[in-house]
Amino acid sequence: MSEQTTTPEVDQTLDLNNEMQERRSKLAALRAQGNPFPNDFRRDSLSGDLHAEFGDKSADELAALGKRVKIAGRIMTRRIMGKASFATLQDMAGKIQVYVTRDDLPEGFYNEQFKKWDLGDIVGVEGTLFRTNTGELSVHVSDIRLLTKALRPLPEKHKGLTDQEARCRQRYLDLIANEESRKTFVTRTKVVAGIRKFLNDKRFMEVETPMMQVIPGGASARPFITHHNALDIDMYLRIAPELYLKRLVVGGFERVYEINRNFRNEGISVRHNPEFTMLEFYMAYADYIDLMDLTEEMLRTLAQDILGDTKIRYAKEGEEGLTIDFGQPFQRLSMVDSILKYNPDVTRDDLATLEKATAVAKRLHIELMKSWELGHVITAIFEETVEHMLLQPTFITEYPAAVSPLARRNDQNPDVTDRFEFFIGGRELANGFSELNDAEDQAERFQAQVDQKAAGDDEAMFYDADFVTALEHGLPPTAGQGIGIDRLVMLFTNSHTIRDVILFPALRPQK
């Protein structure tokens, strides 16, 4: 007879099935005794609050206080020692230990109920705060109830949920098992709240603009297409809210912002998710220099308020990392000057004509499109050779007009615009510019984009006639900016991939 063997994966599946069957049997027994999912327990305390308020109290002080609490949470660990047990409960604010004894509970409850509960079960506890012999703040339980029976076990304590894709697919398990993941998303919430407070304090008004648009605009990107049955028209998930926000400035809302989703039908990478969150804001009677000043102030404020310091550590995966200092003035360089700084063998004259710049790009093995103008080529050289070098906070200014169809031309040099992109950690974080408010110039640039689309550029913009009409009514001198919330959170949490800061990122369906 041949010997049969199983793989570790099969063994794990068998173990899981056996444990789930055992848990289902326990649930069936609980159902026979009543409702195993009650909803009448009300807590009055959170673990983190108890540690904050009573963490420095001595055992004698706690005994004198006799503080009664009602807490609820998930059983994360448990040590059964005959007639007494210790368990760790986890709630939204952290963890706290509870001490359960047979003699403090109704007769038979400890052995027949409590000892049969499992890790992952959710319980409600009432008891008194005390400090154990080892000095740990704990709750001496006088009453404990099962509130939710978990049918699946938690990830193993030491192995945890370490596979990146599994963490994204089962974010609920990731949040249960990984404290760092929970901290990341708490920080994300604080970042968004901090931005709102900062802008509200400066008299910006938060607004909402359409997520489905007849004409996608405001950025160069490939949109998602859907169909509106009642109107029988194709519509696009928005790639940016920009053109609608500027319509509001025309209408008299002179400081507006929106924090919401954008959708771009593009590739997925450590920096890109097809559905992502952006802050866009617009200020009348301001220019791109005002925006750079405002951005410095906002990021410095967020770092100090959320992280407690203007200096943060940041490292891309596999790299040693660096200290990023928001407390110092941010570097400001024109695009051409940045190319010259990081490419000592390139001269200003090398970038003066399309022919010369193309020769530089070919020498650097940069792919170009035949329809590109000089501005496109200079931008491609910058993106390939400079962008990843911009580790400390840096504004790159004077973007070519050819790649900035919505930005105002510079008064001294109409070939470039009053535009900047903000880089940090070698990655783009923000894009802002003095807005183009010349309706005739805007119409010409839209037409140039249409020509580029006809030449094969799928990311070129559509012609938005209604937006041109809005400009014809008069847009005051305005500056506007977009900041990627996901990338900002990556920076503040030292996360290596955008999937770590989006609760439910896009993934290919499992077969």
Curated annotation (Swiss-Prot):
Q: Which keywords does this Swiss-Prot/TrEMBL entry list?
A: Aminoacyl-tRNA synthetase, ATP-binding, Cytoplasm, Ligase, Magnesium, Metal-binding, Nucleotide-binding, Protein biosynthesis
Q: Which organism is it from?
A: Aeromonas hydrophila subsp. hydrophila (strain ATCC 7966 / DSM 30187 / BCRC 13018 / CCUG 14551 / JCM 1027 / KCTC 2358 / NCIMB 9240 / NCTC 8049)
Q: How does it assemble?
A: Homodimer.
Catalyses:
tRNA(Lys) + L-lysine + ATP = L-lysyl-tRNA(Lys) + AMP + diphosphate
**Pfam families per the record?**
tRNA-synt_2, tRNA_anti-codon
Keyword Magnesium among record annotations: yes
What is the name of this protein? Lysine--tRNA ligase
Task: Give an example GO biological process.
Answer: lysyl-tRNA aminoacylation
**Zinc as a keyword?**
no
